Amino acid sequence: MIKLRVMTLNLGGGVKNYSGSSEDLAGKTEAINRLIAQVHPDLLAVQEIAQHIDADGNLDSMVDLIRLAAHFDHAFYGETLSMKRHMQVKKDLMINGLFNDWWDWSKGNALFSRIPFSRLGDESKEGVPRNIPIFQPLVYEGTRDTDPRNVILSRLKVAPFPYLLNLHLTTLTGERGKGAWADSIEQAKLTRTQQMERIIGLLETHVLMKELPIIMLGDFNANP
């Protein structure tokens, strides 16, 4: 049986990856890479990871920075929120980006591995993870309540060929802290339950009913 060291890490806001001075950004990146190096995981699931196009038209991506620094052989980025698709509401971020010479900012989840990914339906062949929506609001309003949510679904190309999940479930305004609202707490629990039910439905026929192994990582925004 293969032994794996797994790690999950929320970077605390894709926006923050590209705000502040260049010295601040370098310090954040160094701290993240140092933490990952200390753990040295075989599998790493990251939430709220960001990338953008710089002034010269080059892709500036935390996914690439982590992959290269930690020497991961395989990486996949799944976008959940983007400047071009959603920022017509949160236009302060768009304007800040335009006049600081970066564009096409997006954030999402990422999966890193030292083992190849396989196809979901054929573990003998290498494949590409899938980025699957589990919550898509009719209108994005620039708030966490309407943040789109996706799950990355993949599989490892090594016995026993476990399926991999990287998810980031919803958290609602008003559900935390001393001033938390009871209605918000209950609505948040219901929303996360619905998202988990969608994931279970996604896996039920081809994974769960066959009792195949699953490794589920992510930020569940919930108490154990």
Predicted regions and their residues:
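Glycine-rich phosphate-binding loop signature in dinucleotide/nucleotide-binding domains
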Residues: 38-39, 158-159, 206-212
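N-terminal, active-site-proximal structural segment of metallo-dependent hydrolase catalytic domains
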Residues: 1-106, 196-200
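Metal-dependent phosphoesterases centered on the DNase I-like endonuclease/exonuclease/phosphatase
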Residues: 65, 172-224
